[in-house]
C-alpha cells in the first residue's frame, strides 16, 4: 500500500512538473497576433482595412506587452499559410457578407479555430452570410452581424 502511494505521489509530482515546465516555456514566447486586411471599400480613404490594422499593430508593438504582430503582406486571405504557425490570435478587418475574406477559406480557418487560435473581427468583418459562414461565425465568436436582422 505504501509503495503504491509513493508511485502515485511520484506520478502526480512528475505530471505537475511537466505542466509547470510547459507553461514556463510557453510564457517565454510572445503572443503572435496575425492581422488580415480586406481590400479597401466604400471609396478612397474610407474603410481602409490595412491602414487600420497597421495602426493597431503599431499600438500593440509600442504597448510593452509581450506580443509579436504580423501583418499579412497581401490584401485578403494569406497566400502563405505558414503565417498562422504559432499564432495566438488572428485579427480580421475587412468587408463582410459576400465580400468577406474568409468565405472561400471557411474549412481552412475552421481548422485553425479548432486548434485553439483566437479570432477578433473588426467592424463589418463581423457580418456573415446566412448558412455555412454564419454557422462558423457562431461557433467561433458566438454571434455575427446578420443583414436585415442585426441593427446598430
Describe every region a protein language model picked out:
Residues 27-87:
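Aromatic-Pro/Gly-enriched surface loop or interdomain linker
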Residues 42-43, 89-100:
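The substrate-binding groove and active-site-proximal loops of carbohydrate-active enzymes
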Residues 12-13, 52, 133:
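Alpha-helical structural motif
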Residues 9-22:
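Bacterial N-terminal signal peptides
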Residues 1-6:
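N-terminal secretory signal peptides that target proteins for export/translocation
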Residues 99-152:
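A glycine-rich, often tryptophan-bearing local segment used as a flexible ligand/cofactor-contacting loop or short
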Residues 32-37, 68-71, 89-94, 113, ...:
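Structural recognition of the beta-strand scaffold that forms the well-ordered cores
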